[in-house]
């Protein structure tokens, strides 16, 4: 009799274990939320975007925004492109 029961349990195991696992998981999930309770989210005074704007304003307050590097000076410090390594330099 035991071999017949083991064969039946082996054959129908997916049909038995999935609903059991689903019920155990659902009960555990609900029990965990019941014990833990709903989390209280802290209310932020400013959004991240507002904080970023404030930080950039504070950084630019001490700088003179009219003094900028010219493009010619800026291009001298840029590295040469990888694709132009094997080309001959123009004289």
From Swiss-Prot:
It comes from Xenopus laevis. Keywords: Membrane, Transmembrane, Transmembrane helix. It is found in: Membrane. This is Small integral membrane protein 12-B. It is a single-pass membrane protein. The chain crosses the membrane at residues 12-34. Belongs to the SMIM12 family. PANTHER family: SMALL INTEGRAL MEMBRANE PROTEIN 12 (PTHR28599:SF1). The keyword Transmembrane helix applies. GO terms for cellular component: membrane. The keyword Transcription does not apply.
């Amino acid at each position: 009799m035991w071999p017949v029961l083991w064969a039946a349990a082996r054959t129908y195991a997916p049909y038995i274990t999935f609903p059991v696992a689903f019920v155990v998981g659902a009960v555990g999930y609900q029990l965990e939320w019941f014990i833990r309770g709903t989390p209280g989210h802290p209310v932020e005074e400013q959004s991240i975007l507002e904080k970023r704007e404030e930080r950039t304003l504070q950084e630019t307050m001490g700088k003179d925004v009219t003094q900028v590097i010219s493009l010619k000076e800026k291009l001298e410090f840029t590295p040469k492109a990888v694709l132009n390594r094997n080309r001959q330099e123009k004289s």
